């Protein structure tokens, strides 16, 4: 009794030519994927550095704008008060950076009220000096 064979020609599993071809392609694929990963990482770092630099520059510009706007406002308030003949002075304390309002008597020049008062400004100046020395 003859048994019919329904199977195809059986090839040995893992022939050398197939393995060699696959491993050569695998090495090339790995190298190109590593290079792509390195390129992506470098691009990401460059974008992050650019973002940080832009944020720092923007913060510095805003700080300059705030200082100039505040100085302009102090000048405008002083002009307005002098135009209505009231003795009131606005200034920015240099050491503490705080805005100061001084109300004084026109005839004598005596200070009636200062906001914040001189003692508080002195405390703020000392704290600022301590911070700078630390």
From Swiss-Prot:
Gene name as annotated: flaG
Location of the region described as Disordered in the Swiss-Prot/TrEMBL record: 1-49
Name of the protein in its database record: Protein FlaG
Family label: To FlaG in other Vibrio species.
Composition bias type Polar residues, residue spans: 1-18
Protein's organism: Vibrio anguillarum (Listonella anguillarum)
Gene3D superfamilies according to UniProt: FlaG-like
């Amino acid at each position: 009794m003859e048994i019919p064979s329904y199977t195809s020609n059986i090839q040995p599993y893992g022939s050398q030519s197939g393995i060699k071809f696959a491993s050569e392609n695998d090495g090339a694929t790995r190298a190109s994927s590593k290079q792509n990963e390195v390129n992506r990482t470098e691009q990401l770092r460059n974008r992050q550095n650019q973002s940080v630099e832009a944020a720092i520059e923007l913060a510095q510009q805003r700080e300059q704008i705030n200082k100039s706007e505040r100085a302009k406002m102090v000048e405008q308030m002083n002009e307005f008060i002098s135009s209505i003949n009231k003795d009131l002075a606005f200034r920015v304390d240099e050491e503490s950076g705080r805005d100061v309002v001084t109300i004084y008597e026109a005839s004598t020049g005596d200070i009636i009220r200062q906001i914040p008062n001189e003692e508080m400004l002195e405390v703020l100046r000392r704290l600022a000096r301590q911070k700078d020395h630390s």
